[in-house]
UniProtKB/Swiss-Prot annotation:
Protein localization: Nucleus
GO BP annotation list: ethylene-activated signaling pathway
The entry's DNA-binding region: 44-101
Function description: Probably acts as a transcriptional activator. Binds to the GCC-box pathogenesis-related promoter element. May be involved in the regulation of gene expression by stress factors and by components of stress signal transduction pathways.
Record InterPro entries: AP2/ERF_dom, AP2/ERF_dom_sf, AP2/ERF_TF_ERF_subfamily, DNA-bd_dom_sf
PANTHER family: ETHYLENE-RESPONSIVE TRANSCRIPTION FACTOR ERF023, ETHYLENE-RESPONSIVE TRANSCRIPTION FACTOR ERF042-RELATED
GO terms, molecular function: DNA binding; DNA-binding transcription factor activity
Record's protein name: Ethylene-responsive transcription factor ERF023
GO CC annotations, alphabetized: nucleus
Length: 192
């Protein structure tokens, strides 16, 4: 493949998606050296970085101090970004660079600007973000309130009694399902 063709295959950048530029990463990284944290930093959200094992973490440096306030470890970057916004607004006020400036009035406020109160308010903000499960370990962004599984029904399985047994849960190798608030055991049938 020619270098020109490789350049064209990169994803397009749209005007409504903020992206990190080389100068922004350089100014945050301190000097021109690339550190391990600059390669794990989220390209859009301030104060958010990704751990090697996939969790997103957030922390903020206290103004005029070398110490940092740990805000937490989260499954999605949006949760970490909300936690950062609460802390940044408390510590820096209206001058803070926020990830979601239009939502700052709706976020919880710490009672004081002590690290402990900031951590509590940041945790509340992060936990208010709804996430959608995409697979076993994958999560995707913010939930818009629609539940994917709401519209899926298996009437043949439920009506014919094909393995569905409303017995109380007994610990074992069988999978468990929560149906209408009650815990039922689903016994797998050999289909082969």
């Amino acid at each position: 493949m020619s270098p020109q063709r490789m350049k064209l295959s990169s994803p397009p950048v749209t005007n409504n998606e903020p992206t990190a530029t080389a100068s922004a990463v350089k100014s945050c990284g301190g000097g021109g050296k690339e550190t391990s944290s600059s390669t794990t930093r989220h390209p859009v959200y301030h104060g958010v970085r990704k751990r090697r094992w996939g969790k997103w973490v957030s922390e903020i440096r206290e103004p005029r101090k070398k110490s940092r306030i740990w805000l937490g470890s989260f499954p999605v970057p949006e949760m970490a970004a909300k936690a950062y916004d609460v802390a940044a607004f408390c510590l820096k006020g209206r001058k803070a660079q926020l990830n979601f400036p239009e939502e700052i009035e709706d976020l919880p406020r710490p009672s004081t600007c002590t690290p402990r109160d900031i951590q509590v308010a940041a945790a509340k903000a992060a936990n208010a973000v709804k996430i959608i499960k995409m697979g076993d370990d994958d999560v995707a962004g913010i939930d818009d309130g629609d539940d994917f599984w709401e519209g899926i029904e298996l009437p043949e399985l439920m009506m014919s009694g094909g393995g569905w047994s409303p017995e109380p849960f007994v610990a074992g190798d069988d999978a468990t399902w929560l149906v209408d608030g009650d815990l039922y055991q689903y016994q797998f049938m050999a289909c082969l």
